Amino acid sequence: MTNAKMTFAVQFSERYINKYIGSPIDDLMVSMAGTTQSYQMRLKRSKDSRAMLTTGWNQLIDAKAFDEGDVCLFHFKEVDDVLVLKVHVLK
């Protein structure tokens, strides 16, 4: 799959993420809970100020890490002053 992206809700973006993305983060490490596989993604603001994962998101989709209809929980945290993201899939 090409050109896949994940866009977060405005309220979530404003409250939790936008303080980290004054400029895009080109090397956000994203991992799936329960695996050791990590993916490098780009986190940036969309034109309507929502946070958006772009480059690399399609790798998660191609890896069949989750299915349509699954609920995903996104856990952003700082590790050694670096923002990282762990994705939990609730089936």
From Swiss-Prot:
One of its GO terms (cellular component) is nucleus. Gene3D superfamilies: DNA-binding pseudobarrel domain. It is found in: Nucleus. It comes from the Eukaryota. Keywords: DNA-binding, Nucleus, Transcription, Transcription regulation. Residues 1-91 bind DNA. One of its GO terms (molecular function) is DNA binding. Pfam families: B3 (PF02362). This is B3 domain-containing protein Os03g0164300. It comes from Oryza sativa subsp. japonica (Rice). The lineage of its organism: Eukaryota, Viridiplantae, Streptophyta, Embryophyta, Tracheophyta.
